[in-house]
């Protein structure tokens, strides 16, 4: 599971997920990519589930890049605990995703195989994504 090795602060404020992805919006490593259409949170478990689905489908034929990293800690209080007494402990890590962000990239496989693999990954993600091909300028 992906998570930071160490952070300056253990807990973060909730914040807001606004705007469009300007950085990381172009395919820069592989030939094909999976791009977010909606905004949302992507947990480390969801990233791992999508990666496994793609890797199993391409049978280790091509190469996959994960372009997102879960660097935001999400805290939760235990069940049946009254409010107050401080912020809860860190339960999991998320990556905040804006529309236009490239999540995964792939190369070394045919377009059909890449589309099938990305379709399997799509089912593991909590928001709409689209398949994109690298454009050569």
From Swiss-Prot:
Keywords: Ribonucleoprotein, Ribosomal protein, RNA-binding, rRNA-binding, tRNA-binding. GO terms for molecular function: rRNA binding; structural constituent of ribosome; tRNA binding. It holds the Pfam family Ribosomal_L16. HAMAP family: Ribosomal_uL16. Binds 23S rRNA and is also seen to make contacts with the A and possibly P site tRNAs. Part of the 50S ribosomal subunit. This is Large ribosomal subunit protein uL16. The gene is rplP.
């Amino acid at each position: 599971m992906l998570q930071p090795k160490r952070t300056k602060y253990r807990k973060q404020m909730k914040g807001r997920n606004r705007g469009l992805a300007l950085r990381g919006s172009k395919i820069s490593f592989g030939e094909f990519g999976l791009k977010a259409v909606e905004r949302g949170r992507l947990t480390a478990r969801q990233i791992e589930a999508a990666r496994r689905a793609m890797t199993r489908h391409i049978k280790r034929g091509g190469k996959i890049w994960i372009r997102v990293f879960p660097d935001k800690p999400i805290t939760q209080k235990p069940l049946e605990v009254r409010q107050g007494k401080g912020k809860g402990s860190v339960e999991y890590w998320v990556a905040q995703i804006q529309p236009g962000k490239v999540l995964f990239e792939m190369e070394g496989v045919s377009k059909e195989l890449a589309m099938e693999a990305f379709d399997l990954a799509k089912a593991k993600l909590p928001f709409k994504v689209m398949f994109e091909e690298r454009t050569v300028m």
